[in-house]
């Protein structure tokens, strides 16, 4: 029996104005992501990977079509409602970690939980658990500048899943790391996804990492197609 569909993109259209012409990025794009599934999004720069991720994660509104998250249509949600859904159900990881430099690793992972309303004590406990799982628990008190690139990215991953999202969207999460560190960080990410059962869509240029996922897709003529 197939796993439950967590994320569904239905005939997504997205275009941008460029000088005197319209640049079509997504054109009736369809895509489904199931619980516990890891999907690699492999496409050249400029193909629309970031646009697809931002649309799927409710950071951008599509010009047409619908994003359905856990059975809920998001096309008619207000900006505040989209923000609430994004905060509760979607985790983001980027190529650059975007950690807050003035806070420790532990505090960076605590913050999204406290914004959601968790107590400081409960947030600290979960943050420490996640850092331990990412094998960086002993560095919890260190600020980002005191961590290596791989350590910073593992903190960013822990932060992304701190609120137990349904979906993890990652845009080149290991793209700024050397091959050995990249493989190690991806292994930690993969273990976390498998253990938690969330669904993950990961954009990457790294074909070796892409082959470690459940399936691979690309963008062709504005549509999502299997590789």
Curated annotation (Swiss-Prot):
Its EC number is 7.6.2.-. PROSITE patterns: ABC_TRANSPORTER_1 (PS00211), ABC_TRANSPORTER_2 (PS50893), LOLD (PS51244). SMART domains: AAA. GO terms for cellular component: plasma membrane. Keywords: ATP-binding, Cell inner membrane, Cell membrane, Membrane, Nucleotide-binding, Translocase, Transport. It is found in: Cell inner membrane. Belongs to the ABC transporter superfamily. Lipoprotein translocase (TC 3.A.1.125) family. Part of the ABC transporter complex LolCDE involved in the translocation of mature outer membrane-directed lipoproteins, from the inner membrane to the periplasmic chaperone, LolA. Responsible for the formation of the LolA-lipoprotein complex in an ATP-dependent manner. This is Lipoprotein-releasing system ATP-binding protein LolD. It comes from Brucella abortus (strain 2308).
């Amino acid at each position: 029996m197939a796993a439950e569909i967590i994320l569904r993109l239905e005939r997504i259209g997205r275009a941008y104005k460029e000088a005197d012409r319209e640049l079509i990025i997504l054109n009736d794009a369809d895509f489904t992501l199931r619980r516990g599934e890891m999907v690699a999004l492999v496409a050249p720069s400029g193909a629309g990977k970031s646009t697809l991720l931002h649309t799927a994660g409710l950071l951008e509104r599509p010009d047409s079509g619908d994003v359905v998250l856990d059975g809920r249509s998001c096309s008619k949600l207000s900006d505040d409602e989209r923000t609430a859904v994004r905060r509760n159900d979607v985790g983001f990881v980027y190529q650059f970690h975007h950690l807050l430099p003035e806070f420790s690793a532990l505090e960076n992972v605590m913050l999204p939980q406290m914004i959601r309303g968790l107590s400081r004590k409960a947030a600290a406990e979960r943050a420490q658990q996640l850092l331990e799982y990412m094998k960086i628990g002993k560095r919890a008190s260190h600020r980002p500048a005191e961590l290596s690139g791989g350590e910073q990215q593992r903190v960013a991953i822990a932060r992304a899943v701190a609120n137990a999202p349904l979906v993890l969207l990652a845009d080149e999460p290991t793209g700024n790391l050397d091959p050995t560190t990249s493989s190690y960080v991806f292994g930690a990410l993969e273990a976390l996804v498998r253990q938690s059962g969330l669904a993950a869509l990961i954009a990457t240029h790294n074909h070796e990492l892409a082959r470690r996922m459940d399936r691979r897709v690309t963008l062709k003529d504005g549509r999502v197609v299997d590789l």
